[in-house]
Structures are given as C-alpha cells and as structure tokens.
Amino acid sequence: MDVSSDKYEKIVDLAARRGFFWPSYEIYGGLAGFYDLGPLGSLLKENIRKLWLDYFVFRHQDMVVLIETPVIAPEIVFKASGHVESFTDPIVTCSKCGKIYRADHLLEDILGIKVEGLRPEELTSIIREKGVKCPSCGGELEDVRTFNLLFQTNVGPYKHDVAYLRPEAAQGMFTSFKRVFNAMRYSLPLGIAQVGRVARNEISPRQGMVRLREFTIMEVEFFFDPEDTEEPDFSRFPEKLRILTADARSKGLDEVVVVRPEEAVAEGIVLNKWLAYWMSVAQAFAKELGLREDEILFEEKLPEERAHYSKQTFDQLVSISRWGWVEISGHAYRTDYDLSRHMQFSGEDMTVYRELKKPKEVTKKSVVIDQELLKEYFGSDTPRVLQALRRLSVEEVEKILSEGEVIVDGFKVPARVFRIEEVKEVVRGRRFIPHVVEPSFGAERLLLVVLDKAYYEEGGRVVLKLPPKLAPYKLAVFPLIPKEESLRTLARRIYHDAVKAGLTVIYDEDGSIGRRYARVDEIGVPFAVTVDYQSLEDNTVTVRFRDSREQIRIKSDEVIKWVLNNL
C-alpha cells in the first residue's frame, strides 16, 4: 500500500470512528454511492456551506440572491433541459455473467487511456480491437449502450405522472428566473444561488465520498446581458489562475498557463468575463478550505467532454491522497440554452427588456404582404392564408423570394405576393434572452478534500489541522483536576458562556489532560482552554493552540472574545 492510499485509509477509519462519515445502511451491507454524515461531519459540512454562502452570495449581495426549489420535478422540465435525452453514461454488459460496467471507466482502468466523451460505437470498436473481456469472468462484452442517470419516480398514484429527482439544482432556478427577476426589480446581472440535495443514478460509484448517488450541491446560475460592456470587479479576487487549456490537452500537453482572470479573457482562454470572475472566486474559496495555490488547477473540458448545454467548461481540480486530481467544482458557460429551451417547451416568455443608455436609429427589414394580390389567388381562403404568412420571419421570406414559391397550410403561395422593405425606427431598448454562467460545487466532496488536507500525524498522534472557521468544534474546555469542584465550576461557567455566544464547544473532564488534548486534536478543535489552580488565584486560564501546541494565559472572562477574534 502506497503512502497516499495508507493516508486515505486512515482518514476513512478516523471518519467512521470519530463521527465524520460512514457508508449508509451498514447493518444491511451498505448501498454503494450513499454515505451518512455523523455529528462531526454534519457540523463540518455546515461550516463549508456557510463559507460557500459567504463567498458566492453574501459577498455579492448586490447581485446574488438565495432561493430554494423542490428536489422532484415533472418530466417536462428535464425534457426541456435536455437531461432526458442527454444525461447519460455509456455502459457495457458481460454476455456471460451479466455484470454491467461503465464502459469508459472500464477501458481507462484496463487500457490506461482516456476515452471520456466517445460515442458508444467508438467505445465498442475499442473493446473489439483490444480484445477487452469481462474482468469478473473473462466473458465476451456486448455492444456499448447508453444509460440515463436520472432517478425516475411518479407523483401521486398515477403512473403517467412521471417525474425525476433533480440531478442539479439549476433547473429550479431557470424555471423560477422570471419570478426572481421581477422580485429583484428587473435588474441584471442577477445571480440565483441554491444549496440542496440532488441525485444521480451513477452506474458504478467509486472513490468513496468522491462520487455519490445522492449529495448536496451548491450552485449559482448567474444571468447577464451578453452585450453588456461593464466589467466585473476583478480586483476583489486578483490572484492568478492555473489553467490547463483544451488546446493543450488535445495535443497531449500538460503545460499549465498561469494568468490573471481578466488576462485569461483578453487572451481568449476564457470565453466570458463572468465565467473568469467566478473562477477567481472559486480559487479564493478553495484556498480558505486549506488548499495551496499549486494544488488548484482549472482544466478546460474538450468539446466531447462538455455537457450538452455548455459552450465552455472548466473543472476546478485539486490534488488529494489516493485519488490524485479530483474535481471540486464545475464552471460552465451555458449561454441562453436553458432559458431558450424552457421558453420553447413551456410557451412562457423568458426574455427581458433593457433600455438603452441612448436611443438609436436603426434600419430594419420588414415583410410586406400584398393582400389585394393574395385575394386574387385565394379568394375566400385569403384570411387563413394571410394568418399563416404572418408567422414567417424575414429570413424565411428571403428564402421564398429566391425559390419562387412556398407551400403554407396546403396552399401554394407565389413569391410575388411578398416584398421586403427597409424601414428606419428609433430603438429605445432591446429584448433578449439572458446568458448564464454557472459555478457548481459538491459539498460532500469538499468535506473529503478538507479532511485530506487537514490530516497530519505528529509524534504518534493524529492532528486535524482544520482551518478554525471550518472546525466542527471551535473550543474545548477542561478542568485540570476534575475532582476539584472549584476548577469544575469555573470550567463549566466558561463552557456555558461559550455556548451562549454561539460557539460549538466541548467540555471534557475524562482522563488525563494529555489524553484530552489528543482527543480534541484528532477532531480538529483549534483551541483548548484549561482551568488550573492558578486560575483560582489570578482569574487566568491556559489557552492551547492545536497546531503548534503552544500555550498562553488570558483572563477567564476574555476567553469568548479571544476565540471569536481568532476564528
């Protein structure tokens, strides 16, 4: 077992033993892709959520709001979004034992080649050419086919009321866009954020907490005018990004570009300024989770790897034990895909109107229909034909003029009934469908990353060097001699004051002081206060720092203020 695998096993053992996480339904043998969060894991995840909200919502209150939408949505929502058709992975079945594998992962594991994004027939060809067999029994593999990852259910007792568990929070934000836009006084840019549960029926979830069938997603759908020239305030998060471009990847190169976000836009590396901006926010957020800059990389997805809705996607990768580089967030430029599709499927207007700073005169093409000539051709059918013709666009009429005629509702209409005129008009505003960029994070995966970066072994003891903001418990309070009632009384008073102040705090009087320090070091408590005999003389207590083990003395009535100032 290599060092990184050994570290990972130790983290998993610690997580189960001390109450961070463990496989769900263990007493029945577990269920792949599902994990429970214990008392410490729940607190750690909540602190990650709060930090994410701070970066992506509360620091952007002038343009980002928080909403909540259901986990279940009717089938039409996911038909419109493209998930019913496109949210699939390739699978292959053994013709002998019947075992099913995710085809691209199988080939990557056996052949060591990257095949993500290849079509089923291309994967089948590789299986045949390389003679890949079933790893379990050696049997022949069938042709590769697609498997939809949506969890299907029914709403109420009727089987025809098909619905799905959402695989992303995004669609609830898209379908609610006009409501939120109106509530926020028709302002763009507008970010709609959501934190909630999602489900993906993964074929063969692996890598523990890295790939789950149910997890908490944290997303922003950021709506903006694609013609708006106003720049994001890049100075708020000015650090450089490490980017591996799709161009480099397509050439088999691993040369990383280090560039400021605004420079990445200017040089055409990132297609949209808001995409670059939210990538810079994501980098700052990741560093506060305990990651170094050299451990963070934005990898641009190749065209065949991108989701059906994306014009450009970057995965934010971080390096962790055993699994190497793993994705902690995805950053997609979804353009107007989602709003356009929901507009098409629902019939609701998803456009917005913006007044121009200065009205301008424009020349537009307009279709004119010669109604008198139309009557000569169609007589009493003229109203019906006219109604159909009025639905034609300028582009469609231009095509008719070049072809000579068109058949509409069964009537052959000659081109001579049309003409196109240019008219001048004063435009005071424009109507358009907003574009969207999306930063999206998985909370449980972040939890694993945070534990991986915080885990240290020092002098035979385990220390979780969690950032104090993220630590499940901020403070531990110990009476040095538990049997001494006066020490216990002061320690309990400090404990209760800490609870009243909103701190998560542990009170422990079991065992030696060394054992108590070791127990709280192992779960990442950053500060420990010990009440000793000197405390009774001068009203001071010892504060011990988890990472350095250094100790200082402060007044007992200043403990709460001191802890709050050092988080």
Feature-to-residue mapping (PLM):
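NTP/phosphate- and nucleic-acid-binding module
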Residues: 1-567
